[in-house]
């Protein structure tokens, strides 16, 4: 495997340049579809059946590829996203380039490099005959960076049809893979009071800002140690004139949840918040909810990790796993009850920034590692 992978290093760089130099921001569906077509052709060339779906009202391009019957669960699901956070025109400003052992460009790390890893792994497995027995389902969506609103059910359904999931989000510097992620949610609290003259008739007013301030203090108590909840009020709006008691105030809250208990606690808190005003005759409404459940590893995940770690050791590669506050579609596959390992893409960092990069030396290392893991899974199929 190693020699075959190393012989294709320049091809990988050519492929990476092609992909990075395609604008595929979440709002630019033509670019996302172009990415999907690139992979569709390559997957079909190694015997996969493919389809490009247009999901949701916005017709988000999503690619599915599979090499065995869909009537049985696939041995592995390869999961990734084709969209980036960057707007149309970003590629023209700063196209793909290489400098000092690193590759730069929009989405090079998050996560076009990872998508390409999955392709080159499968091409390697095809060359070595592993795909004769191993069943793989590939699912690439086009709206991950905006919350996977149109594709989450599709991802969940495909995960349920798989025995395990590899998510090709970036591997962190130092070969740090991801087994645990916090869940994410947001809530908007809208308080309606009663306007009045702040000087002449303040007693006739109901101060929405005061009510909101007290609610914010209550929200902050969610952050107690061990609660499994991080609740951060990040936006506040209220009042429009100095001499008027404000009749409306709004706060927005970023929620991160470490475990399923934290998820329940946050949902319960905001569900009953409108029923617990501090001021009389005030009206409170709450919008939002939990968007991504927490990614919490169980013993099946750690068993899968043991295989990855063993194969890394064979390659003299030191790896470890981490927990992170950022979310991915791996949150959904874990919630589906399917063992999931994330961060299977290229080593890199500075995601969502202009100095985003991947480490070139990680290309062959990561492809070889994952190919060996897949081969092991194939040889020990039950």
Task: Please describe what each predicted stretch is.
Residues 79-80, 139-141, 166-169, 190-192, ...:
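Short beta-strand segments
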